[in-house]
Amino acid sequence: MYKRQELTREQAIQQILDELSPNDIVVSTTGMASREVFEYRAQNNQGHQRDFLTVGGMGHASQIALGIALQKADRQVWCLDGDGAALMHLGNIAINGSLQPKNLKHIILNNGAHDSVGGQPTIGFQVDFLKIAQASGYQHTSQAKTTQEIKNKLAKIRELSGLSLLEIRIKKGARENLGRPTLTPVQNKERFMKFLSP
């Protein structure tokens, strides 16, 4: 039996975004996570140019983030992944480890469920993402379960040079009134590309 998680994904994402710098790059996984990123930016008048929302691309966020990290080595790249998405393309962790981008910060929001497509259970709480990452060559791995732990871990990760993974244990579910992005994927891409330009 697994201990019930108290932190929501939305609380975790808000805490993450609060800790990032204006020049940091964010790639978020498909579904609820990207919707929560978009809504939080809108509510705080932060704009959406810093975030690439991986709409309909389950499992691909970390490889998109990897490509950006390799090309933008002078900037921090944060990948907001899900346990279901990470498990779907588990080889991505090995690829990240083999290429060793020092500026890639891989965050897995683990609620043990495919939350965006019906809430079916995953094996996210049975798999040890930290050990998989370590065996694949990630230099720094850690886990958080509270907003304070997220704050502390992110502060440490930011100062570390090297490929990092932070697993955040969360409960499944989302607000019933959670909105959807009001930008099209093409508009998101164009604003994001402009943000990446020198």
What are the roles of these predicted feature ranges?
Residues M1-Q5:
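Conserved small/polar residues in nucleotide/adenosyl-binding loops
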Residues E10-Q14, E19, I25, E39-P198:
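Thiamine diphosphate
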Residues T29-E39:
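N-terminal glycine-rich anion-binding loops that anchor highly charged ligand groups
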